[in-house]
Amino acid sequence: DAEQHGEVALKDANAKLQDLKAALQQAKEDLARLLKEYQELMNVKLALDIEIATYRTLLEGEECRMSGECQSSVSIEMVHNTTSSSSGGSGALGGGAGGRGGLGSGGLGSGSLGSGRLGSGGRGSRASRGNLALDSSSGGGSAVRGSVSNSGGSCAVSGVGGRGSVRVTQSSSQSQRSHHKL
């Protein structure tokens, strides 16, 4: 009788062990799915942070230029590598005064940086010059090289391994101007 009781307890323990193994496997699959979703969201966040920083820097430079107090040199550098891939896309980093551009389908967050122009636009000003060209690099990264002309400046994006990073710098030099009323 005790032997039967022991066998039943062993079967119950094995059944619980199998249930726990199945639950562990399901949890691992869920964790992998959530990690992939998190990485995709972080790629989108990085792209949006880049776009926000670019527009902020360009706006500050344009305000300074329009006030005539300084000449601005804008330098934007973004390094990004992604392991996800896209079936193509037409997104653009930036956009002109007409509001075209932005992150399109298959934009930077999906593994490719769309072709387009990086322009300042707005408040009746002309868009800054600066074409961006897409270069593919090994390892799933994307690279864009180009320049932005807002009284000088440059934009360089390189695909490298590791996590993405953004660096936006702006240097201004005061120009002495005197206005005389006649």
Curated annotation (Swiss-Prot):
**Segments of this protein annotated with the region V2 subdomain:** 87-162
* Residue ranges of the region described as H2 subdomain: 67-86
- Which portions of the sequence form the region Coil 2B? 1-66
- Disulfide bond residue pairs: none
What InterPro entries does the record tag this protein with? Answer: IF_conserved, IF_rod_dom
Q: Where is this site: Stutter?
A: Q4
- Which top-level group of life is the source organism from? Eukaryota
Task: Give me the ranges of the annotated region E2 subdomain.
Answer: 163-182
| Compositionally biased region (Low complexity) | 144-158, 165-176
Residues annotated as region Disordered?
Answer: 104-182
One cellular component (GO) term of this entry: intermediate filament
Residues covered by region (Tail): 67-182
Spell out the Gly residues composition-biased ranges.
104-124
Give UniProt keywords alphabetically.
Coiled coil, Intermediate filament, Keratin
List, for all copies, the residue spans of the domain called IF rod.
1-66
PANTHER family named among the record's database cross-references: GATA-TYPE DOMAIN-CONTAINING PROTEIN, IF ROD DOMAIN-CONTAINING PROTEIN
Report the family membership: Belongs to the intermediate filament family.
Additional remark text: There are two types of cytoskeletal and microfibrillar keratin: I (acidic; 40-55 kDa) and II (neutral to basic; 56-70 kDa).
How does it associate, per the subunit comment? Answer: Heterotetramer of two type I and two type II keratins.
Q: Write down what this protein is called.
A: Keratin, type II cytoskeletal 68 kDa, component IA
The species this protein was found in: Bos taurus (Bovine)
